[in-house]
Amino acid sequence: MSDSAPNPFPVAWSDPRREAAFHDWLRQVAPAHALQPATVRPASADASFRRYLRIDGDAGSYIIMDAPPEREDCAPFVKVAGLMAAAGLNVPRVLAWDQPQGFMLLDDLGSRTMIEVVDAEPTPATQALYLRAVDALIAWQLASRPGVLPPYDEPLLARELALFPDWYLAKHRGLALTPEQRETLDAQFRLIMQRNLASPAVYVHRDFMPRNLMIPRDAAEPRLGVLDFQDAVHGPITYDIACLMRDAFLSWDEEFVLDITVRYWQKATKAGLPVDADFGEFYRGVEWMGLQRHLKVAGIFARLTLRDGKPKYLADAPRFIGYIRATANRYRELAPLARLVDQVEGSDAVTGFAFGRV
Protein backbone atom coordinates (compact mmCIF):
# COMPACT_ATOMS: atom_id res chain seq x y z
CA MET A 1 0.00 0.00 0.00
CA SER A 2 1.40 3.43 -0.87
CA ASP A 3 1.65 6.24 1.66
CA SER A 4 -1.25 8.05 -0.02
CA ALA A 5 -3.70 5.12 -0.03
CA PRO A 6 -6.51 5.39 2.55
CA ASN A 7 -6.11 3.05 5.48
CA PRO A 8 -9.09 0.70 5.94
CA PHE A 9 -8.86 1.15 9.71
CA PRO A 10 -10.62 4.23 11.07
CA VAL A 11 -9.08 6.56 13.61
CA ALA A 12 -10.31 5.72 17.12
CA TRP A 13 -11.06 8.47 19.62
CA SER A 14 -11.56 7.85 23.34
CA ASP A 15 -12.82 11.40 23.94
CA PRO A 16 -15.74 12.56 21.75
CA ARG A 17 -14.99 16.20 22.58
CA ARG A 18 -11.44 15.88 21.31
CA GLU A 19 -12.67 14.10 18.20
CA ALA A 20 -15.06 16.98 17.48
CA ALA A 21 -12.31 19.54 18.11
CA PHE A 22 -10.02 17.67 15.73
CA HIS A 23 -12.54 17.66 12.90
CA ASP A 24 -13.26 21.37 13.44
CA TRP A 25 -9.53 22.13 13.25
CA LEU A 26 -9.06 19.92 10.20
CA ARG A 27 -11.86 21.71 8.34
CA GLN A 28 -10.08 25.00 8.99
CA VAL A 29 -6.62 23.94 7.78
CA ALA A 30 -7.68 21.65 4.93
CA PRO A 31 -8.23 24.28 2.20
CA ALA A 32 -4.76 25.85 2.51
CA HIS A 33 -3.08 22.49 1.89
CA ALA A 34 -5.75 20.82 -0.29
CA LEU A 35 -6.22 18.13 2.36
CA GLN A 36 -8.71 15.29 1.95
CA PRO A 37 -10.31 14.75 5.39
CA ALA A 38 -11.81 11.40 4.38
CA THR A 39 -8.31 9.92 4.04
CA VAL A 40 -7.23 10.40 7.67
CA ARG A 41 -5.80 7.14 9.04
CA PRO A 42 -3.38 6.05 11.77
CA ALA A 43 0.32 6.45 11.02
CA SER A 44 2.10 5.59 14.26
CA ALA A 45 2.24 6.08 18.01
CA ASP A 46 5.18 6.29 20.38
CA ALA A 47 5.97 5.78 24.04
CA SER A 48 4.44 9.14 24.97
CA PHE A 49 0.83 10.30 24.80
CA ARG A 50 1.33 11.60 21.26
CA ARG A 51 0.08 9.80 18.19
CA TYR A 52 0.47 10.45 14.49
CA LEU A 53 -2.09 10.33 11.70
CA ARG A 54 -1.58 10.44 7.95
CA ILE A 55 -3.76 12.40 5.56
CA ASP A 56 -3.70 12.87 1.80
CA GLY A 57 -3.58 16.15 -0.07
CA ASP A 58 -3.36 17.08 -3.71
CA ALA A 59 0.44 17.34 -3.42
CA GLY A 60 0.92 14.08 -1.51
CA SER A 61 0.51 12.94 2.06
CA TYR A 62 0.99 14.83 5.32
CA ILE A 63 1.34 13.91 8.98
CA ILE A 64 -0.89 15.16 11.77
CA MET A 65 0.37 15.12 15.34
CA ASP A 66 -2.34 14.56 17.95
CA ALA A 67 -0.84 15.63 21.28
CA PRO A 68 -3.35 16.37 24.07
CA PRO A 69 -2.05 19.59 25.67
CA GLU A 70 -2.68 18.39 29.21
CA ARG A 71 -0.30 15.49 28.48
CA GLU A 72 2.17 16.85 25.92
CA ASP A 73 3.83 20.21 25.32
CA CYS A 74 4.48 20.69 21.61
CA ALA A 75 6.53 23.89 22.00
CA PRO A 76 9.86 22.02 22.39
CA PHE A 77 9.12 20.06 19.20
CA VAL A 78 8.59 23.27 17.25
CA LYS A 79 11.73 24.88 18.70
CA VAL A 80 14.00 21.90 18.04
CA ALA A 81 12.56 21.40 14.55
CA GLY A 82 13.66 24.94 13.77
CA LEU A 83 17.14 24.37 15.20
CA MET A 84 17.59 21.15 13.25
CA ALA A 85 16.36 22.64 9.99
CA ALA A 86 18.78 25.54 10.44
CA ALA A 87 21.56 22.99 10.97
CA GLY A 88 20.74 21.37 7.63
CA LEU A 89 18.96 18.28 8.93
CA ASN A 90 16.02 16.68 7.15
CA VAL A 91 13.17 17.25 9.60
CA PRO A 92 9.43 17.75 9.08
CA ARG A 93 8.26 21.33 8.60
CA VAL A 94 5.50 22.58 10.88
CA LEU A 95 2.79 23.66 8.42
CA ALA A 96 0.00 24.42 10.89
CA TRP A 97 -0.21 24.31 14.68
CA ASP A 98 -3.12 24.74 17.06
CA GLN A 99 -1.12 25.12 20.25
CA PRO A 100 -4.05 25.30 22.72
CA GLN A 101 -5.55 22.06 21.38
CA GLY A 102 -2.37 20.19 20.48
CA PHE A 103 -2.99 19.52 16.78
CA MET A 104 -0.16 19.98 14.27
CA LEU A 105 0.19 19.47 10.51
CA LEU A 106 3.65 18.35 9.36
CA ASP A 107 5.53 17.30 6.27
CA ASP A 108 5.43 13.54 5.70
CA LEU A 109 9.01 12.25 5.53
CA GLY A 110 7.86 8.77 4.54
CA SER A 111 6.72 5.54 6.12
CA ARG A 112 9.95 3.51 6.25
CA THR A 113 12.20 3.86 9.24
CA MET A 114 15.85 2.89 9.18
CA ILE A 115 15.21 0.01 11.58
CA GLU A 116 12.82 -1.51 9.04
CA VAL A 117 15.35 -1.64 6.23
CA VAL A 118 18.69 -2.45 7.87
CA ASP A 119 19.89 -5.99 7.30
CA ALA A 120 20.17 -8.48 10.13
CA GLU A 121 23.90 -8.58 9.48
CA PRO A 122 26.21 -5.56 9.08
CA THR A 123 26.25 -5.51 5.28
CA PRO A 124 27.76 -2.66 3.23
CA ALA A 125 24.24 -1.27 2.73
CA THR A 126 23.64 -1.22 6.48
CA GLN A 127 27.01 0.40 7.09
CA ALA A 128 26.14 3.08 4.52
CA LEU A 129 22.89 3.85 6.33
CA TYR A 130 24.69 4.19 9.65
CA LEU A 131 27.24 6.52 8.10
CA ARG A 132 24.39 8.69 6.81
CA ALA A 133 23.10 8.77 10.38
CA VAL A 134 26.57 9.80 11.55
CA ASP A 135 26.57 12.66 9.04
CA ALA A 136 23.25 13.92 10.41
CA LEU A 137 24.53 13.65 13.97
CA ILE A 138 27.67 15.64 13.24
CA ALA A 139 25.68 18.38 11.48
CA TRP A 140 23.43 18.61 14.54
CA GLN A 141 26.34 18.76 16.96
CA LEU A 142 28.17 21.39 14.92
CA ALA A 143 25.20 23.73 15.35
CA SER A 144 25.47 23.58 19.16
CA ARG A 145 25.25 26.73 21.25
CA PRO A 146 25.05 26.89 25.04
CA GLY A 147 21.95 28.33 26.66
CA VAL A 148 19.58 27.39 23.83
CA LEU A 149 18.38 23.94 24.94
CA PRO A 150 17.85 22.69 28.51
CA PRO A 151 21.07 21.48 30.15
CA TYR A 152 21.59 17.76 30.57
CA ASP A 153 22.84 18.39 34.08
CA GLU A 154 23.25 16.39 37.28
CA PRO A 155 19.64 16.80 38.49
CA LEU A 156 18.31 15.47 35.16
CA LEU A 157 20.80 12.60 35.12
CA ALA A 158 19.85 11.73 38.70
CA ARG A 159 16.13 11.73 37.90
CA GLU A 160 16.73 9.43 34.97
CA LEU A 161 18.89 7.00 36.92
CA ALA A 162 16.28 6.87 39.70
CA LEU A 163 13.89 5.23 37.25
CA PHE A 164 15.93 2.01 37.47
CA PRO A 165 15.47 1.34 41.21
CA ASP A 166 12.03 2.94 41.38
CA TRP A 167 10.41 1.21 38.41
CA TYR A 168 12.56 -1.66 37.17
CA LEU A 169 13.76 -3.02 40.50
CA ALA A 170 10.95 -2.09 42.89
CA LYS A 171 7.84 -2.28 40.72
CA HIS A 172 8.80 -4.68 37.93
CA ARG A 173 11.09 -7.04 39.83
CA GLY A 174 9.37 -6.52 43.17
CA LEU A 175 12.74 -6.02 44.85
CA ALA A 176 13.09 -4.02 48.05
CA LEU A 177 16.73 -2.93 48.22
CA THR A 178 18.48 -3.36 51.54
CA PRO A 179 20.13 -0.24 53.01
CA GLU A 180 23.49 -1.62 51.91
CA GLN A 181 22.27 -2.25 48.36
CA ARG A 182 20.75 1.23 48.20
CA GLU A 183 24.01 2.77 49.36
CA THR A 184 25.93 0.76 46.77
CA LEU A 185 23.59 1.80 43.98
CA ASP A 186 23.69 5.47 44.98
CA ALA A 187 27.50 5.42 45.03
CA GLN A 188 27.60 3.81 41.59
CA PHE A 189 25.13 6.36 40.25
CA ARG A 190 27.28 9.22 41.55
CA LEU A 191 30.28 7.72 39.77
CA ILE A 192 28.36 7.32 36.51
CA MET A 193 27.13 10.91 36.65
CA GLN A 194 30.59 12.24 37.46
CA ARG A 195 32.12 10.46 34.47
CA ASN A 196 29.40 11.52 32.06
CA LEU A 197 29.25 15.15 33.13
CA ALA A 198 32.98 15.42 32.41
CA SER A 199 32.27 15.04 28.68
CA PRO A 200 32.11 18.22 26.55
CA ALA A 201 28.56 19.42 25.89
CA VAL A 202 26.82 19.68 22.52
CA TYR A 203 23.24 19.42 21.28
CA VAL A 204 21.82 15.99 22.17
CA HIS A 205 18.82 14.45 20.39
CA ARG A 206 18.35 11.88 23.23
CA ASP A 207 16.67 9.23 21.06
CA PHE A 208 18.96 9.18 18.04
CA MET A 209 18.37 5.63 16.84
CA PRO A 210 17.18 3.82 13.69
CA ARG A 211 13.59 3.79 14.91
CA ASN A 212 13.58 7.60 14.69
CA LEU A 213 15.47 7.92 11.40
CA MET A 214 13.51 7.85 8.16
CA ILE A 215 14.42 6.61 4.69
CA PRO A 216 13.65 9.49 2.29
CA ARG A 217 11.07 8.88 -0.41
CA ASP A 218 13.35 10.63 -2.89
CA ALA A 219 16.29 8.33 -3.63
CA ALA A 220 18.32 11.41 -4.56
CA GLU A 221 17.96 12.83 -1.03
CA PRO A 222 21.15 11.89 0.86
CA ARG A 223 19.87 12.97 4.27
CA LEU A 224 17.96 10.60 6.50
CA GLY A 225 14.83 12.08 8.03
CA VAL A 226 15.06 12.78 11.76
CA LEU A 227 12.06 12.44 14.10
CA ASP A 228 11.18 12.35 17.81
CA PHE A 229 13.57 15.14 18.73
CA GLN A 230 11.38 17.14 21.12
CA ASP A 231 13.36 16.10 24.22
CA ALA A 232 16.66 17.49 22.91
CA VAL A 233 19.08 18.95 25.45
CA HIS A 234 22.62 20.37 25.69
CA GLY A 235 24.77 17.61 27.14
CA PRO A 236 27.52 15.00 26.74
CA ILE A 237 28.85 14.57 23.21
CA THR A 238 29.00 10.81 23.84
CA TYR A 239 25.24 10.42 24.27
CA ASP A 240 23.81 10.26 20.76
CA ILE A 241 26.47 7.98 19.31
CA ALA A 242 25.91 5.64 22.27
CA CYS A 243 22.19 5.77 21.57
CA LEU A 244 22.73 5.01 17.87
CA MET A 245 25.03 2.04 18.39
CA ARG A 246 23.60 0.55 21.61
CA ASP A 247 20.05 0.69 20.37
CA ALA A 248 16.98 0.14 22.51
CA PHE A 249 15.47 -2.14 19.85
CA LEU A 250 18.42 -3.52 17.89
CA SER A 251 21.71 -5.16 18.88
CA TRP A 252 24.98 -5.30 16.95
CA ASP A 253 28.19 -7.21 17.51
CA GLU A 254 30.99 -5.20 19.06
CA GLU A 255 32.97 -5.23 15.81
CA PHE A 256 30.26 -3.28 13.97
CA VAL A 257 29.69 -0.94 16.93
CA LEU A 258 33.40 -0.13 16.98
CA ASP A 259 33.54 0.31 13.21
CA ILE A 260 30.78 2.93 13.10
CA THR A 261 31.86 4.61 16.33
CA VAL A 262 35.44 5.06 15.16
CA ARG A 263 34.19 6.46 11.85
CA TYR A 264 32.02 8.91 13.78
CA TRP A 265 35.03 9.85 15.93
CA GLN A 266 37.21 10.41 12.87
CA LYS A 267 34.60 12.63 11.21
CA ALA A 268 33.92 14.50 14.45
CA THR A 269 37.63 15.09 14.96
CA LYS A 270 38.03 16.40 11.42
CA ALA A 271 34.99 18.67 11.89
CA GLY A 272 36.47 20.16 15.06
CA LEU A 273 33.96 18.72 17.49
CA PRO A 274 35.24 18.31 21.08
CA VAL A 275 35.80 14.54 21.11
CA ASP A 276 38.72 13.05 23.05
CA ALA A 277 41.93 12.91 21.01
CA ASP A 278 42.37 9.26 22.00
CA PHE A 279 39.73 6.93 20.56
CA GLY A 280 40.09 4.45 23.42
CA GLU A 281 39.24 7.14 25.95
CA PHE A 282 36.41 8.40 23.79
CA TYR A 283 34.93 4.91 23.46
CA ARG A 284 35.09 4.39 27.20
CA GLY A 285 33.13 7.63 27.56
CA VAL A 286 30.57 6.31 25.08
CA GLU A 287 30.19 3.13 27.14
CA TRP A 288 29.69 5.01 30.39
CA MET A 289 27.11 7.25 28.75
CA GLY A 290 25.39 4.22 27.27
CA LEU A 291 25.27 2.64 30.72
CA GLN A 292 23.39 5.64 32.08
CA ARG A 293 20.93 5.48 29.20
CA HIS A 294 20.30 1.76 29.56
CA LEU A 295 19.62 2.06 33.28
CA LYS A 296 17.18 4.86 32.52
CA VAL A 297 15.46 3.04 29.66
CA ALA A 298 15.00 -0.15 31.70
CA GLY A 299 13.12 1.97 34.22
CA ILE A 300 11.12 3.80 31.56
CA PHE A 301 10.06 0.59 29.84
CA ALA A 302 8.93 -0.87 33.17
CA ARG A 303 6.92 2.30 33.80
CA LEU A 304 5.37 2.15 30.33
CA THR A 305 4.21 -1.39 31.06
CA LEU A 306 3.04 -1.00 34.64
CA ARG A 307 1.67 2.55 34.62
CA ASP A 308 0.76 3.25 31.01
CA GLY A 309 -0.41 -0.18 29.83
CA LYS A 310 2.17 -0.54 27.01
CA PRO A 311 3.71 -3.97 27.67
CA LYS A 312 5.50 -4.32 24.32
CA TYR A 313 8.40 -2.15 25.48
CA LEU A 314 9.41 -4.30 28.43
CA ALA A 315 9.94 -7.23 26.07
CA ASP A 316 13.27 -5.59 25.20
CA ALA A 317 14.42 -5.51 28.86
CA PRO A 318 16.88 -8.41 28.40
CA ARG A 319 18.71 -6.32 25.80
CA PHE A 320 19.20 -3.48 28.30
CA ILE A 321 20.26 -5.79 31.08
CA GLY A 322 22.78 -7.32 28.69
CA TYR A 323 24.15 -3.87 27.84
CA ILE A 324 24.31 -2.92 31.53
CA ARG A 325 25.99 -6.15 32.51
CA ALA A 326 28.56 -5.98 29.69
CA THR A 327 29.68 -2.47 30.63
CA ALA A 328 29.58 -3.00 34.38
CA ASN A 329 31.74 -6.11 34.06
CA ARG A 330 34.27 -4.33 31.89
CA TYR A 331 35.23 -1.61 34.38
CA ARG A 332 36.56 -2.35 37.85
CA GLU A 333 34.89 0.74 39.31
CA LEU A 334 31.53 -0.72 38.32
CA ALA A 335 32.01 -4.13 39.93
CA PRO A 336 29.48 -3.35 42.71
CA LEU A 337 26.83 -2.55 40.09
CA ALA A 338 27.66 -5.75 38.21
CA ARG A 339 27.21 -7.82 41.37
CA LEU A 340 23.90 -6.12 42.16
CA VAL A 341 22.54 -6.74 38.66
CA ASP A 342 23.61 -10.37 38.87
CA GLN A 343 21.81 -10.73 42.20
CA VAL A 344 18.63 -9.28 40.72
CA GLU A 345 18.71 -11.12 37.40
CA GLY A 346 20.02 -14.42 38.72
CA SER A 347 22.55 -14.92 35.93
CA ASP A 348 26.28 -15.38 35.76
CA ALA A 349 28.34 -12.32 34.99
CA VAL A 350 29.66 -11.82 31.48
CA THR A 351 33.23 -11.01 30.66
CA GLY A 352 34.42 -7.83 29.02
CA PHE A 353 35.28 -7.60 25.36
CA ALA A 354 36.97 -5.24 22.88
CA PHE A 355 39.18 -3.30 25.27
CA GLY A 356 39.03 -5.94 27.98
CA ARG A 357 38.53 -5.24 31.65
CA VAL A 358 40.03 -1.92 32.71
Question: What do the PLM-derived regions correspond to, one by one?
Answer:
Residues 165-172, 238-274, 288-308, 320-327:
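Active-site activation/catalytic loop segments of kinase-like enzymes and analogous catalytic loops
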Residues 36-41:
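Conserved N-terminal boundary motif of the eukaryotic protein kinase catalytic domain
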Residues 22, 29-31, 145-150, 156, ...:
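An alpha-helical support segment within catalytic cores of ATP-dependent transferases
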Residues 49-56, 64, 94, 103-104, ...:
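Active-site acidic catalytic loop and adjacent metal/ATP-binding pocket
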Residues 296-358:
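ATP/Mg2+ or Mg2+-diphosphate-binding catalytic cores
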Residues 43, 48-157, 162-163, 169-174, ...:
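ATP-binding pocket architecture of kinase catalytic cores
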Residues 2-33:
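Juxta-kinase regulatory segment immediately upstream of eukaryotic protein kinase catalytic domains
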Residues 129, 205, 230-237, 283-291:
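Secondary-structure capping and boundary motifs in well-ordered enzyme cores
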